[in-house]
């Protein structure tokens, strides 16, 4: 009786206790195993009840369907399969079952035949099917001719990468749910994820992470018709459809591998609300894939997506919270090892490796195994014929021309089938259209529509230009992306006519669009564009004409030059034009005359050199840019020392080559007679590089007038710069902002300034780590120099003592300085006393900036005393952020009444408030006030002072510029100002109203003022909530020819789509009006006073 009660107690209550110990995910797993192990005699299990059951309900269901001891027997088996050994042991001890009833083996996830059958839902058959399908993973053709042990080394490296793809991020602590494996075409992405499928099926990868892994290939998916997601993932299941409910029941244990995203021919433009989450409903496959990628379908599931670098930007727009991993391919050591194993003659190997490594772009391409093999094969043929591999490796186009030609070269007496010109043109058109549309997989029907017959395709397959996919029917691809890009470039060389306005011209034939493309916006076009320029080389053309026995036209040269001229005359800034990419293309031509012609319309270039290849192409092209006047340049990484890891002798390394390229680049300073400005910034130059630069600066033919060396580290201080200042009589402007020259560096500069041969007029030393100790040297230089008129010492810790020394020079009659900036130099009221005396005695100083110093009201009083002195000739005074209050308004008002020279005053970011401004306005509207530019930005003003400001606008005929930004004027205040702006005697040309709390309510007043005022040409309205209604009101005026506004400060992206359309329409109707967010009056071309600092 006791036994009976005991056995009934545990099924009724004891089992519930154990179920309570399972977390939510473990409970779901328990239910799935329960579904799999239900005994047949019980008939259909009420799965819907089990799936929804809480723990107590589940215990009751098990009692019902497994009476007596059977419930515990099933439960213990499930606990064992879930590897919950502790629960198994505790349960067995409590119910004291004998070993015969429940043996130890029953509590483990055993491998008996019974358990294999019971756990059919674990995907055993599916795993077997995957093993059959993916057993041949590593494509031995990808590295033809290499030893097996080399192949094994690459496999081991990439296997480790696979194992850690879904590891927890050590920085964020998050486990990635979406991993994007990106890399160049052919680098091995597909091979790697197929290997992942095989390893998972064999039980050696992701076993604790994913219960099911599914492989979805882009090429196959493109050919599928409408279906459900369940049908899509069941394609590899042994039966018609897998145990889909079980699979979907725990989506967090699913991994979907989406291979070759770049080959999916889907636009992915479906709105999110239209996407599907029901895996049983049929949809177009494009909808299913979009739903999966955008986490609408099975949001808990994990994704591993492979894509080429050229389409990663397109993929990024679809994904949320993804983790990028780049597959780099063969390392430098691996490439070297491969080359040395490919060539039996080690001298040949050394020559090939050295030649490839000298071209960083080409050597980078060889990270792809197939490209490395092709390069070695091609260069080996060249060397066997006695050719110069150095020339072949000079450009990527030269090497690929050689390789493509080798595919049609007779071997062993055989004669390859050459395509006729029509066939070749059709192939090139297919390639070009594919590159433009990012189509890399072609189906038989597509090729037929594009003009390639099956006979044509077979011919190109025989020549290893095109290959048929062995697994997916009717799929064709070029043997490598670079092969497609090369034939795409050839399309433009075979095109017969380049007449303008040809109505039959297709988008991919637009050369102007191709030239304007950038690697950031259109990375898929970059290499094709390089190949196109490379094919302009006459030697390349002759080689291809011999190979294909056809005629290629160089008429495209003149067409490209026309497009370059249009770009050169456009409004694009140098940074927008992407000169580095252009130089890559021009370098491919190796045609000096063409480069000179192409660059004749570009007076200014901006390039950022951060790789050796950048230095190579820039130095080559800049020598032939004869019309250059300005070079803006940044050089990083290139000159950093590195430990060499190569078996080559050290004299073959590219250190000498880097020096030679830098020498070539710097030689432009004396070979280009038009060059006037060099802006070298944020650059790391070693001692040798700096010596080369200074040597060129001292060259007698160097005509440079303006030299900017901002944020530069000088290995040997400023001695070389100082010497250049003496030798180069053309140099008038030197900017060393952010360069850590220190007091010692300034000492050297001051010695040069005192030299009679030094003609420097402008010296900018902002943020140069200067202290009071350099001020005596500067003071002496100011007295001795007869040319220096502009000195900027901002953001240096000079303090009042340093300024005292400078003021001694300012009071000297031989000091010729006209403009001085001491912004953020640690000055106080004490420093103003010295400056005040200097202003009275100095007859030449016209511009003084004291911004960002704690002068206080006492300091302003001292400056005001100087201003009202009759001998003070100051024209511009900047007191921005000087920590004074409305009390200073009284001092300034008095001095401004007497001062006749001051025309520009900046009082921004001080606590003036309405009362202070009202005091100033009494002076500003006085007929004798000569003020032209007034800066009151951020002065804690409200609409209460706007009547006074309006009075100034009306009564001061000299006032041209007024900035009231960052004040709480609101709509009522602007309405008052607009009333004044409408008067015909208003002379305001620039008005700043940024961040003034404006809404759409003031836009009608602004519109009215813009119509009436014929002098207002610049207005800033950024950081206001004008909204769509406000833009509608402004739109009517802005598009009118009566509106004379030239620059309007507005951020288009801050408005909704409809408002943005209106602003775009304004640009069409009124092309003279520029709308931009950075409506900055302080531009170099503007003669506004503030730019002088």
Swiss-Prot record:
Tissue: Testis-specific.
Effect ascribed to mutating residue 86 to V: Increased tendency to form aggregates
Domain NACHT intervals: 177-499
Location in or out of the cell: Cytoplasm
Annotated ranges, domain Pyrin: 1-97
Gene Ontology biological-process annotations: cell differentiation; regulation of inflammatory response; spermatogenesis
Keywords recorded for this protein, A-Z: ATP-binding, Cytoplasm, Developmental protein, Differentiation, Leucine-rich repeat, Nucleotide-binding, Repeat, Spermatogenesis
Result for mutant: residue 84 to R: Increased thermal stability of the Pyrin domain
The UniProt record lists the keyword Ligase: no
Molecular function per GO: ATP binding
Residues holding ATP: 183-190
CDD domains listed in its UniProt record: LRR_RI, Pyrin_NALPs
Signal peptide: none
Pfam families per UniProt: LRR_6 (PF13516), NACHT (PF05729), NLRC4_HD2 (PF17776), NOD2_WH (PF17779), PYRIN (PF02758)
Free-text comment about domains: Upon heterologous expression, a small proportion of the isolated Pyrin domain forms homodimers and higher oligomers.
Family that this chain belongs to: Belongs to the NLRP family.
Protein name (record): NACHT, LRR and PYD domains-containing protein 14
Organism: Homo sapiens
């Amino acid at each position: 009786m006791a036994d009976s009660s005991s056995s009934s107690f545990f099924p009724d209550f004891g089992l519930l206790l154990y179920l309570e110990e399972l977390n939510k995910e473990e409970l779901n797993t328990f239910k799935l195993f329960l579904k799999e192990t239900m005994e047949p005699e019980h008939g259909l299990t009420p799965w819907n009840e089990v799936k929804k059951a809480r723990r107590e309900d589940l215990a009751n269901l098990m009692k019902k369907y497994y009476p007596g001891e059977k419930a515990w027997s099933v439960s213990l088996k499930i606990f064992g399969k879930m590897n919950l050994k502790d629960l198994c042991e505790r349960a067995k001890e409590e119910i004291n079952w004998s070993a015969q009833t429940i043996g130890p083996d029953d509590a483990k996830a055993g491998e008996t035949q019974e358990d294999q059958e019971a756990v059919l839902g674990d995907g055993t058959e599916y795993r077997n099917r995957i093993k059959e399908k993916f057993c041949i993973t590593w494509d031995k053709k990808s590295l033809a001719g290499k030893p097996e042990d080399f192949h094994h080394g690459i496999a081991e490296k990439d296997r480790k990468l696979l194992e850690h793809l879904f590891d927890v991020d050590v920085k964020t602590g998050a486990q990635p749910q979406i991993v994007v494996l990106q890399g160049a075409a052919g680098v091995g992405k597909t091979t790697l994820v197929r290997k992942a499928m095989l390893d998972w099926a064999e039980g050696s990868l992701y076993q604790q992470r994913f219960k099911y892994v599914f492989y979805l290939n882009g090429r196959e998916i493109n050919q599928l018709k409408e279906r459900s997601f369940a049908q899509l993932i069941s394609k590899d299941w042994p039966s018609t459809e897998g145990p889909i409910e079980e699979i979907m029941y725990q989506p967090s244990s699913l991994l979907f591998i989406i291979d070759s995203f770049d080959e999916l021919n889907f636009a992915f433009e479906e709105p999110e609300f239209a996407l599907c989450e029901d895996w049983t409903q049929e949809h177009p496959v494009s909808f299913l894939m979009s739903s999966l990628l955008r986490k609408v379908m099975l949001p808990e599931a994990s994704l591993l997506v492979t894509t080429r670098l050229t389409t990663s930007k397109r993929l990024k727009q679809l994904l949320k919270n993804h983790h990028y991993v780049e597959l780099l391919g063969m390392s430098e050591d691996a490439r070297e090892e491969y080359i040395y194993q490919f060539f039996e003659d080690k001298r040949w190997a050394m020559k090939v490796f050295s030649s490839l490594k000298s071209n960083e772009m080409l050597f980078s391409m060889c990270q792809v195994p197939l490209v490395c093999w092709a390069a070695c094969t091609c260069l080996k043929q060249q060397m066997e014929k006695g050719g110069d591999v150095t020339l072949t490796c000079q450009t990527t186009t030269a090497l690929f021309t050689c390789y493509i030609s080798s595919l049609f070269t007779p071997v062993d007496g055989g004669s390859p089938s050459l395509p006729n010109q029509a066939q070749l043109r059709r192939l090139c058109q297919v390639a070009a259209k594919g590159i433009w549309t990012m189509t890399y997989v072609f189906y038989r029907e597509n090729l037929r529509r594009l003009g390639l017959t099956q006979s044509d395709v077979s011919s190109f397959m025989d020549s290893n230009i095109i290959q048929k996919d062995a697994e997916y029917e009717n799929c064709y691809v070029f043997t490598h992306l670079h092969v497609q890009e090369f034939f795409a470039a050839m399309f433009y060389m075979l095109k017969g006519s380049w007449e303008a306005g040809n109505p039959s011209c297709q988008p991919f034939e637009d050369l102007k669009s191709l030239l304007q493309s950038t690697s950031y916006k259109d990375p898929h076009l970059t290499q094709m564009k390089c190949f196109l320029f490379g094919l302009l080389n006459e030697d390349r053309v002759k080689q291809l004409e011999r190979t294909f026995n056809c005629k290629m036209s160089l008429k495209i040269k003149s067409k490209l030059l026309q497009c370059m001229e249009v770009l050169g005359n456009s409004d694009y800034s140098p940074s927008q034009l992407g000169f580095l990419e252009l130089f890559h293309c021009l370098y491919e031509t190796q045609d000096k005359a063409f480069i000179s012609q192409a660059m004749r319309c570009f007076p200014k270039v901006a390039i950022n050199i951060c790789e050796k290849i950048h230095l190579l192409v820039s130095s080559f092209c800049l020598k032939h840019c004869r019309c250059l006047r300005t070079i803006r340049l940044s050089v990083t990484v290139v000159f950093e020392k590195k430990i060499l890891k190569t078996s080559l002798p050290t004299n073959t390394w590219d250190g000498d080559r880097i020096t030679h390229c830098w020498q070539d680049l710097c030689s432009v300073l004396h070979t280009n007679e038009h060059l006037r400005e060099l802006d070298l910034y944020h650059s790391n130059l070693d001692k040798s590089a700096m010596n080369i630069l200074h040597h060129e600066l001292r060259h007698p033919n160097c005509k440079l007038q303006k030299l900017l060396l901002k944020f530069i580290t000088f290995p040997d201080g400023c001695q070389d710069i100082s010497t250049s200042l003496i030798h180069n009589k053309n140099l008038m402007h030197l900017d060393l902002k952010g360069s850590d020259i220190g007091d010692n560096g300034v000492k050297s500069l001051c010695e040069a300034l005192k030299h009679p041969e030094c003609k420097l007029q402008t010296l900018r030393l902002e943020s140069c780590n200067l202290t009071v100790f350099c001020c005596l040297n500067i003071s002496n230089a100011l007295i001795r120099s007869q040319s220096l008129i502009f000195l900027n010492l901002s953001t240096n810790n000079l303090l009042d003592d340093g300024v005292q020394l400078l003021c001694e020079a300012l009071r000297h009659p031989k000091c010729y300085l006209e403009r001085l900036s001491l912004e953020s130099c640690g000055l106080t009221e004490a420093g103003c006393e010295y400056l005040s005396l200097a202003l009275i005695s100095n007859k030449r100083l016209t511009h003084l900036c004291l911004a960002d110093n704690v002068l206080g009201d006492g300091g302003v009083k001292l400056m005001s005393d100087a201003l009202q002195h009759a001998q003070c000739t100051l024209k511009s005074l900047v007191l921005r952020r000087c920590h004074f209050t409305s009390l200073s308004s009284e001092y300034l008002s008095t001095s401004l009444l007497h001062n006749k020279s001051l025309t520009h005053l900046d009082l921004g970011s001080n606590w003036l408030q309405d009362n202070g401004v009202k005091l100033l306005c009494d002076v500003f509207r006085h007929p004798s006030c000569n003020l032209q530019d007034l800066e009151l930005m951020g002065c804690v003003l409200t609409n209460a002072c706007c009547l006074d400001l309006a009075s100034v606008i009306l009564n001061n005929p000299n006032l041209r510029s007024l900035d009231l930004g960052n004040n709480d004027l609101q709509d009522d205040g602007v309405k008052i100002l607009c009333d004044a702006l409408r008067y015909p005697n208003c002379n305001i040309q620039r008005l700043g109203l940024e961040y003034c709390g404006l809404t759409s309510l003031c836009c009608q007043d602004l519109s009215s003022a813009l119509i009436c005022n014929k002098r207002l040409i610049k207005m800033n309205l950024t950081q206001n909530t004008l909204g769509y209604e406000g833009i509608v009101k402004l739109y009517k005026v802005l598009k009118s020819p009566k509106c004379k506004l030239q620059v309007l400060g507005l951020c288009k992206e801050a408005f909704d789509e409809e408002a943005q359309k209106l602003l775009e329409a304004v640009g069409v109707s009124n092309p003279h009006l520029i709308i931009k967010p950075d409506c900055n009056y302080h531009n170099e071309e503007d003669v506004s006073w503030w730019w002088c600092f």
